[in-house]
């Protein structure tokens, strides 16, 4: 039996607040599974099973479409539209039809790609740095916003950063913790900000 036979998928929006102005600047879409008793399961509880059956891209697309549907409703109600971030798994990143699939969903709900932020982790096993750069360039060409997650955990470096126009750079927590306590980390971070 599939997960959908026992569990209900739910997409939540986690607000993103500007630390300087304390104003809402966007949101990140998160998916959870809930059973009939109301128990909520986090990705770590169900992603391994989905990976085993090669179903992760279906979840990526499901979340993306749910967000597009939400944005369409907001527009119909005259609400101000802020970017919503959707995670892309490495399984989706290697799909040759990714761009066209996402654009098709955007057109279905009359949503502009500029309202969608695609969150890509640089900590992936099936995507080389060259492939990642090519993917980001193509997504940016289609006007999608790009967020690089977990910066500093894999091959993300100044060369990668200079090759791409990221809209958002999420620094890995392990680096943030070291700031101020490790002079080498602080120097590297200062150099990054200068660029």
Model-derived segments and spans:
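The catalytic core of metal-dependent phosphodiesterases that act on cyclic dinucleotides
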Residues: 105-179
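Catalytic-site/binding-pocket detector for metal-dependent nucleotidyl cyclases
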Residues: 8, 54-55
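Conserved long alpha-helical elements within nucleotide-processing catalytic cores of c-di-GMP signaling
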Residues: 47-48, 57, 137
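A short, hydrophobic C-terminal helix/tail in secreted or cell-surface proteins
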Residues: 194-195
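Catalytic core of bacterial c-di-GMP phosphodiesterases, primarily the EAL and HD-GYP domains
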Residues: 23-28, 55-132
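Cyclic nucleotide signaling catalytic output domains
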Residues: 45, 49, 66, 87-88, ...
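Active-site core of bacterial EAL-family cyclic-dinucleotide phosphodiesterase domains
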Residues: 1, 5-49, 87, 148
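Conserved adenylation A10 loop of the ANL superfamily
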Residues: 190
